[in-house]
Regions:
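Short, low-complexity intrinsically disordered segments enriched in small and basic residues
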Residues: 1-7, 11-25
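Anion-binding alpha/beta catalytic cores of soluble intermediary-metabolism enzymes, centered on
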Residues: 30-270, 275-343
Length: 343
C-alpha cells in the first residue's frame, strides 16, 4: 500500500481526479447545539478539515451508496475511494452521470472479498472512514470484527443510529441494531458508552438515555428489566458512562408525555426529553427502526463506533441522502475522536 492519498495499490484514478495539492477549501466549523432538532445542518457541524476524508467504499456497485458518497464529496468533506469490480462500477458511474467526478478506483476481481480489500486500505493508513457498500451486513462485519484485521480497539464495536421522527422534537439515537445480537450486561455498558460518546461528539454534555423494555416494572420473568435496573443503579453509584440513564422504560413512556400522564409515570423526559434509546437486543432495535422508516417516514443515518476508524453502515436500500448523512456522522465522530486522543 502507498503511504499517502490517493496512491493505492491496483488503483485507477478517474479522469476528473484533482491534481496533487489541488483539493478544495473546507467549511469552517459550524455552531454546535446541545440538541439536534433535525438533520438540516448536520454537515455544517463538521469541523474544518485539512483535506477531504478518504472514504473507502467496500462494494462500489450499489446505486444509492455511490450517489450518497458523491453527494458528500459535493458537500466538500470526503474523497471517494471505490473498491469493487471496475467494469461494473464505471458502468454505474456513467449511467448516473458521475464518471467524470474525482474518485479513486480499486479494482477487485470477482470472487475476491471487497471488504477485506477495503480494510487493507484502511490498515495501510490510506483511509479515514470505512463504508459498507453493495455487500451483505454479514459479509461486511465478519472481517471488520476479525481481530487479525486490526480495526479493533480497547472498545467494543457497536452500531449507533440517529433518527429523525416526525412526531419527536429532536434527533433520537438508537443502539444497537446491527452488531451485538444478544448483549450481555457488560456489552450493554459498552453500547451505552458508545452511544453517549456519539452524542457527545455533537456537543451533548450529559445525554439522557432510555433503557427500553416491554414494561417499566422490574420483573424477574423478564431479564432485560432486571439488567436495566442494575445498569441504572450502577451508573448512579459508580458511573461507567458520561450520561444519564433511565429504565426499564416502555416505548410509549419514552415517546409520549400523554402516555406517561395516563399511566401516572413520573419521568421528566417522557415525550421528547430523551436523547437516545438503548434496546435490549438487536432484533428489537432493528424492528423498531424499520417500523419507523416504513410507517413514520423517518430519516436515519448510522455508524459503527468503537473501531479504529468510523464505519458508515446503512441499509443497502437506504436513500442516497441517508448515505450522505451517515458519512457526515462519521466525519463528526472522527473529529471528536482525534480531539479526545490529543487531550
Amino acid at each position: 500500500m502507498g503511504q499517502g492519498p490517493p496512491i493505492i495499490k491496483k488503483a485507477f484514478v478517474s479522469p476528473g481526479a484533482p491534481p496533487e495539492g489541488g483539493l478544495p477549501e473546507y467549511r469552517e466549523k459550524g455552531q454546535r447545539e446541545m440538541e439536534l432538532k433535525n438533520f438540516d445542518n448536520i454537515v455544517d457541524l463538521i469541523p474544518k478539515l485539512e483535506r477531504p476524508l478518504r472514504v473507502i467504499l467496500a462494494g462500489s456497485d450499489g446505486e444509492n451508496m455511490v450517489r450518497g458518497i458523491f453527494q458528500a464529496q459535493e458537500a466538500g468533506f470526503v474523497q471517494p475511494v471505490l473498491v469493487g469490480d471496475r467494469a461494473r462500477t464505471i458502468a454505474l458511474l456513467e449511467r448516473l452521470g458521475l464518471a467524470q467526478k474525482p474518485y479513486t478506483m480499486v479494482d477487485v476481481a470477482p470472487g475476491h472479498n471487497v471488504t477485506q480489500e477495503a480494510i487493507d486500505i484502511v490498515r495501510s493508513g490510506d483511509g479515514d472512514i470505512l463504508m459498507r457498500g453493495n455487500t451483505s451486513t454479514r459479509h461486511f462485519l465478519m472481517p471488520v470484527l476479525d481481530p487479525s484485521n486490526g480495526l479493533r480497539t480497547n472498545r467494543l464495536m457497536t452500531h449507533v443510529s440517529l433518527v429523525s421522527l416526525p412526531e419527536y422534537p429532536k434527533l433520537l439515537a438508537l443502539s444497537d441494531m446491527t452488531v451485538i445480537i444478544k448483549p450481555t450486561l457488560e456489552e450493554k455498558k459498552a453500547i451505552i458508552r458508545n452511544t453517549a460518546d456519539a452524542l457527545k461528539a455533537f456537543g451533548y454534555e450529559n445525554p439522557r438515555l432510555a433503557l427500553l423494555s416491554l414494561v417499566e416494572e422490574v420483573t424477574f420473568h423478564m431479564q432485560d428489566t432486571v439488567e436495566a435496573q442494575r445498569l441504572v443503579s450502577e451508573q448512579s453509584r459508580r458511573p461507567f458512562a458520561d450520561c444519564e440513564l433511565w429504565g426499564p422504560i416502555a416505548y410509549d413512556l419514552i415517546i409520549s408525555k400523554e402516555a406517561a400522564r395516563l399511566k401516572n409515570y413520573d419521568c421528566p423526559y417522557s415525550g421528547g426529553g430523551f436523547d437516545g434509546i438503548i434496546a435490549p437486543d438487536l432484533s428489537t432495535a432493528n424492528i423498531l427502526v424499520k417500523s419507523w422508516l416504513i410507517h413514520a417516514h423517518a430519516v436515519t443515518c448510522g455508524a459503527v463506533v468503537g473501531a479504529r476508524v468510523p464505519i458508515a453502515l446503512t441499509s443497502r436500500s437506504a436513500a442516497a441522502e441517508e448515505t450522505e448523512l451517515s458519512l457526515a456522522f462519521c466525519a463528526i465522530l472522527d473529529a471528536w475522536r482525534k480531539k479526545q486522543d490529543k487531550a
